[in-house]
Amino acid sequence: MVTAKTQYSLNNAQSYFAEHLAVGDYYQEGQKVAGEWFGVGAQSLGLKGVIRENDFLALCENQNPQSGETLTQRTNTVREEDGKTTANRRIFYDFTFSPPKSVSAMALLADDKRIVAAHQRAIQIALKEFEAFAATRVRKDQADDTRLTRNVVAGLFTHDTSRALDPHLHTALHRLQRHV
C-alpha cells in the first residue's frame, strides 16, 4: 500500500528531520534511522549515500546543498485560499510504502531477512517506475505546462515499527520539489 501526504510548511519540514529522523527511529528509543538519497536529481546535485541533515534542510529551503544557489524561482511565499494563509510552494511529498501487516509480522517477528530484502527490492522497482514518470509543472504567462523530467530528488527512510510500537515494516520516501 502507498499513502501520500503533501508537506507545505517549511517549519514542519525542518522539524520532521529533527524530530523523527535525525534523533533516531521515531518509534524505538536509541535507534537511528539513516536515510538514503534516491534519484537522478539527487545524483546530479552530488547527493548520494546517507542523508546529512544539513543537505536535507538546504533542499527544504530551496537551496543547492553544495553551492547554496536557489534551485527554483518560486520561494516559500504565501497566498490566501478560502480565507486562510497557505504556502505557495510544496516542500516535499511524503510517500509511505507499506506491505500488509502479515508481511511485517513475518519479516520482523520471525526475523526473516529474506522478506525485508524482498520489501527493499519491491521499493526499488516501484521507485524506478516512479522516476520514469516524474514531471514538473511550469507556469508562464498564466498558462501551465507539464514537462517530463524523469528525475527526482528523494530521501528514503525505512522503519520497522509503528508509532504504537507494533511491528510495521515501511519505507518513507520524501520526494523533494526539485527537478534538475
Residue ranges and their predicted role:
Residues M1-L169, H174-V180:
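Intrinsically disordered, flexible peripheral segments
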